Amino acid sequence: MIGKRNASKRTRQDDCITYEEYQRKRKKTFLNTFVNICSRTVTYAKLFLTKTPISELDRIAGEAIPSNSNSTNSKLEPSTKAPESRFSHINSKTERGYVTVESDMSSHNTLDRNSKPTVSHSYTNSSKDEKFLDPIALQNLFSPASDTHSQNIHDEALSPSSFRVSRSRYFPRPHRSSKNLSVSNRLQLAVFKETTSSTLSHGNSVEADEINSFNPTPFSSSPLHFTNSSPNPNSDIVTPDKQLDVVSEHARYKHLPFTATLRKKSPHDSTSRKASFRFVQSDQQPARNIVTSDIQNEKSLLLLIRDLKEKQTESFQDWNEVDFLQLKGLEISPPPTRPKFIPELEFPDNARKRALKYLNQSNSVSSSEPIITKFNIPITLKDLHTLRNRQWLNDEVINFYMNLISERSKIDSSLPRVHGFNTFFYTSLQRRGYAGVRRWAKKARVNIADMDAVFIPVHLDVHWCMAVINKSKKRFEYWDSLAGSPGKVFDLLRDYYIAETKGAVDVSDWENFMDDNSPRQRNGHDCGVFACKTAECVSRNVPVQFSQNDMPELRIKMAASIIDAQIY
């Protein structure tokens, strides 16, 4: 059982840089497992000596509740009545037979190693409607005449809004819910303060450090503090909820670069838009976090860049902070100014309505049935839904659209002669060289030497780019909406074109072209649309003029083009 439980914690060899590091981490994992076994053995021994019923501990594991008890050396002895306290409303609602662990959270830092929490059996039925709704009662609760030791609303022993903060300081939040943990792990959470503190994850450790350094602001007992209005957005007061939000955000994105400088700070984000008191009822429930689409796009872009750096060192190994900030256009310089995309192709209203109908249609059993089949590519509703906003395009959609571009050039003689390979061409060329793709043009019944432009989608695991062999302009082009370096793309294209044309076309004076003012994406989802639309513009020999703001409309046009098998 122990081996199965710790299987996910063991270090895999491919996660380590060297074999010595793998052996070192493996020994550390075995040592931690041995220490955990010893700790559980001591835990069972303590519970056996104190005669604590094992059957009741399943209910209390990991749910220690603070109280104002001042005992630091209490024994694990069951009582028949729950202690009465004027702050008993802070505790969870209990039912008959519910067991709680009561300890002094305010003096938890002064506990010695031999101190133990008190386990008490509560057999009273507390009222489920027990709330403080009267502002006067709340004012009296924190009045100077009160016999409590503090008037601070952020005190762990007093403030319901700070209860979650004080609990997170000592009791970790495991990856699984407490009821799914093993008995030994739950016993550790209920008995050992040192053990629970040491098992904090990195994110929770950062959160605990931030909370411990938090200096609460004095609380005034004026009735004005109990209004239903939201706090002043420009206030400098740092509430516990705001503290947890900041710490959680830092812990979640600490591995990403430039997060601190890229996030746009708004004066309305200085405090949480939620009242500090849980028991104050309000007619309006404002959102706790104001997350705009810009922030979501920024996070998705950061994650995309991180994945590209991890998986594709060829194209993104030379990136630095300055390059990324220039790409984002937040701190150093704005992104290239592009004119608003003006549709040059006819887009009928009925085609738009059909596209919106399919895009808004919910997934069903019939979603696996092809909507249209052409070029030996079936397009299902699931494939078409990749053209929804914030979705990645799949191979079927991109291949179908590239075939539409090739077919249009054959029908309309006024357009340049172009051919588009599918999404697997560059992967085969990269892995096997010309030998892996030497029959592709023959199967497509095209002569590459006669084509004015050849389009090759470049797939970088989680990112789409477009490479072009532009014979009419005598250059090899690379279009990347993230402005990444081309890597070996130009060399592979040059070698392929020379081998495919058998030297009939002289490419010695051809240039490697990258447009510094090319359209750039500002999220982590639209790279496929950028690549396809770039190929469509080059196939008509028109400037590549569109921007991130045009993506919703371009997605609809691509969906309509696929449904009607005609580019709009």
Curated annotation (Swiss-Prot):
EC number: 3.4.22.-
GO function terms (MF aspect): deSUMOylase activity; SUMO-specific endopeptidase activity
Its job: A cysteine protease that proteolytically removes the C-terminus of pmt3.
Family: Belongs to the peptidase C48 family.
Residues spanning the membrane: none
Gene3D superfamilies: Adenoviral Proteinase, Chain A
GO terms, biological process: positive regulation of mitotic recombination-dependent replication fork processing; protein desumoylation; protein processing
UniProt protein name: Ubiquitin-like-specific protease 1
Entry-linked SUPFAM superfamilies: Cysteine proteinases
Compositionally biased intervals (Polar residues): 66-77, 116-126
Gene Ontology CC terms: cytoplasm; cytosol; nuclear envelope; nuclear periphery; nucleus
Region (Disordered): 64-127
Lineage, opening ranks: Eukaryota, Fungi, Dikarya, Ascomycota, Taphrinomycotina
Organism: Schizosaccharomyces pombe (strain 972 / ATCC 24843) (Fission yeast)
Claim: Hydrolase is one of the keywords in the record: yes
Keywords, comma-separated and alphabetical: Hydrolase, Protease, Thiol protease, Ubl conjugation pathway
Ranges annotated as biased composition (Basic and acidic residues): 83-96
InterPro entries: Papain-like_cys_pep_sf, Peptidase_C48_C
Residues at the active site: 463, 480, 527
